[in-house]
Amino acid sequence: MHSDAPTPVANELSEVSHLAEGDNASFSAGNFTVLQLPSDPSHCIDYAIPAGTLVIVDPNNPDNNRTVKLQAPAVFRPQCALGGTRAPAPRPEESFPDWSEYQKYHHNDRRDPFYGSVTPIAYTIAASTVTAWMLLIILFLSRKPSPLFQKIAVLITAVSLTVFLAQATDTLESQYNEGYQNAYELRHKIMGGWAFRILQVITCVITWLARLQVVIRLFDVPKINTRLAVVGSTLIFTNATIWACLNLIPPWSQYVRNAKSVLPVFGALCSLLLEVFYLVVVVIYSISKRKYAYSRTSIVMAAISWLAMILPMVFIVFDIAHYWIAGWSDFIRWTADAAASVVVWEWTNVIVYQERREQRQSVLGRQVYRDEILDFKGDNGGGTVGGGRTKYPSRMEEDDVPFRSSPNDHHFTSNIPTSAGEGQSFQFFKRARLPMYSRKIWKIARGESAASNNTHYEHAIIEEEEEESIERNRRTPTVQENGEEDDEETYDEENDQYSQDNHSSVHSFESSRPSQHPVPSSGGTRAVGHTHFPLPGQSEGAHTTSPAAAAAAAEPEPEPVAGPSGGAAAHGDSDDDSDNSDDSSLASFTVIQQTGFSVDNQGVPEYDADSAPPTFEPIPGFHRQDYSDAKG
């Protein structure tokens, strides 16, 4: 638009700048057009103007319209009262004939870089929203259940990003209709509202709680899980408190930073510390399971998991280094934080599946640690929680033992006849003598085949230096594949018969009372080992004998019974003249392995539908009254 107003000289740019002051001032030049000049002093910017005719139009006051003839390229600088953040340059049009002249002096145009424009913001919001909804669909379509916090975190992330995408679309459409693009306005429209600030704090807490669930699943040792939970919870709520102060307490804001305040930097460092903590824990787990974590079938899942864990750390560093990246990197961080829990959880499922499949095909089975308690009460306490953590059985309701148990006790349930009647539950508790940190190695025997349903657990051997001398003098009974114990036979000259010296392990005790040999039941049972337990209130060297036990000892010795495989019985006769007669108060029972009972790869017993749970067959002559007499 040209006017007939008098043309001022070319060097009167100060007058041009003065006339351009105003909220709705606009001007046009030969090569491009600015529809509206910035009215906020913080939006001041220099505009490169090539040679040509410059027409200044003031819609509020047409009398102020001026036309300037520029003989050479120039720079238009509004006389703003204050300096501040520069707004992007006006939108040029390549259709103008002097576009090449404008390109020559493009270096004078102080527009924001491309990564600070509206384009990265639009792309990142759209891509992050699509990724979040895909994660949510995968999470709910998965056959295995996912943690509750994980579902809530992904759902909130997907809904929040959808709301932000709608706001960004409306703002970009408004700017397009007015003929300009302003990244600052777009960021302020999305991130300046209370919805974004509140959702950011809530999503931060729930997402990190979902990650904490993943961390707790990775380790089966309860003490390690407790420590990780305490450290992780402390870091999570500290980080949430910092970001709540930055977003909810004015005048602090995440994007309007005060150089004198260290709170934004401290919050970023706290977030970085959380990311490192999560990464280190997952790396330790993946190294311990490297055979399964980085196999050919799981290498793709491992790469995606690493990418999801590293991306938030990279963008946190970028946010600290450069201001403009914070305008769109937050959306990537939101999606990456949600994916870091979902993808790592699925990666763990792949690792556990491969490990279980190999353990079912192997001979040794799975490892059992010191802190794990194997529950043999069937459906009452068996089973696992999450990804393989052993479920700790509580004190059993039907237990009428007159002393209380602790989490360190080993539970052995028996079908010993009690005063309440035949078949009532009876339970022995063997107190753990060694500290919690000592590990337990279970001797495992396989019967007839290498399948996991033939796994039998024997006595526990404690790896302690002070027990080395005891281990050299004692031999732990082993279980052969036919179910019989390999005991040494000695000749008793006085009684003119052979007897077997039953050596006990660290946690077992010998009884001088003649041992009785169980007869296999019709269900195809097999004796897999025997354990002797002292009665409560009696020590190993006690010299007291209950009347019932004395009567049982006076009974005639039965004939040896053949074992399940047709050979001699696993237990022989002990020496009647030995010095161990003071141990007659010790109760002895034999574990009977029934057909259909198996131990799965998690160390939890499983039963077939047509078979009964495993029982403990007592020594004949030992009754519940003996237990009461011994305790009294």
From Swiss-Prot:
Residues 1-120, 167-189, 250-264, 319-330 are extracellular. Residues 623-632 have a biased composition (Basic and acidic residues). Residues 546-571 have a biased composition (Low complexity). It is a multi-pass membrane protein. Belongs to the palH/RIM21 family. One of its GO terms (biological process) is cellular response to pH. It is found in: Cell membrane. Residues 142-145, 211-228, 286-297, 353-632 are cytoplasmic. Residues 497-524, 590-601 have a biased composition (Polar residues). Residues 380-389 have a biased composition (Gly residues). The chain crosses the membrane at residues 121-141, 146-166, 190-210, 229-249, 265-285, 298-318, 331-352. This is pH-response regulator protein palH/RIM21. Required for the proteolytic cleavage of the transcription factor RIM101 in response to alkaline ambient pH. Residues 380-419, 462-632 are annotated as: Disordered. Keywords: Cell membrane, Membrane, Transmembrane, Transmembrane helix. Its main location: membrane. InterPro entries: PalH. Residues 482-496 have a biased composition (Acidic residues). GO terms for cellular component: plasma membrane. It comes from Yarrowia lipolytica (strain CLIB 122 / E 150) (Yeast).
